[in-house]
Amino acid sequence: MDRKTDLRLWAVLFWLAAWQIAAMALAAVYPHGELLLASPADVLLRLGQLAVTAAFWRTVAWSAVRIFGGFLLATVLAVALAALAAWKQWFRGLMAPLVAAVKAVPVASFIILALVWLNSQSLSLFISALMVLPPVYLNGLEGICRTDRRLLEMARVFRVPLGRRLRGIYLPQVMPYFRTAVSLGLGLCWKAGAAAEIIGLPAGSMGERLYTAKVYFQTADLFAWTVTIVAVSVVFERLFLALVDRLMGKAGL
């Protein structure tokens, strides 16, 4: 274990201990202090109870399919739009105010507006895609625009096929930007998707479980579902980035 990992572990243990002490202090002061702040032990116990049920995994899968589906949809669309914007200056100008608006408007506003157009079942997919689109588009566009023009001119003069140009010139330049955008987008899509589910309350979603726990003051459940969302987000990010790195390695990038 290196020093950096060791420091992170101690930091996590410190905050878990602080959380446990705060929960115990509230329980000592108030008759029902656990309603205000569940202890880490209670949350872990409740998470274990939930994790052995089929309903828990159905709920996780329900949300994961829609949120990650929105991420994939936005990623494909953003890459295509970035390529077109790099090729056509007028299209880049056309996209600029739209991307700026999506970045500036609060996600809650988009969620409420989207509920006018969509049913709650598809809300998290749409909102996740909407939040992922700007960072992937902008990073992809920057990567393409920073491609060495001398290499492109040389490829044009020697009539290098498009496939070889993509692999030998564009991909090595764009992939670092793409990887950064993917890492950022995966975090954004889960935050936005969970917010959409909490507001839209689609049946069978993790957002609905969070809202129900809040209504009935089931604080341990509230923390357990929050931990689940964070854990699933981290797992998806690690797996997807590992896949990207593997593909880059196979392509010799």
Regions found by a protein language model. Name each.
Residues V116, I144, A192-I229, G252-L253:
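Glycine-rich helix-loop "coupling/hinge" segments at transmembrane-helix boundaries
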Residues N139-F178, L210:
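Short cytoplasmic-facing helical segments at TM-TM junctions of multi-pass membrane proteins
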Residues A100-P135, E142-G143:
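Generic hydrophobic transmembrane alpha-helix motif, especially the helices
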Residues Q89, T180, A224-L253:
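C-terminal transmembrane helix and the adjacent membrane-cytosol boundary/short C-terminal tail
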Residues F126-L130, L162-A196, A224, F240:
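Transmembrane alpha-helices
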Residues G69-V99:
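Transmembrane-helix boundary motif in ABC transporter permease subunits
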Residues L26-L72:
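Periplasmic/extracellular loop-to-transmembrane helix junction in inner-membrane transport proteins
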Residues R3-Y30:
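N-terminal signal-anchor transmembrane alpha helix
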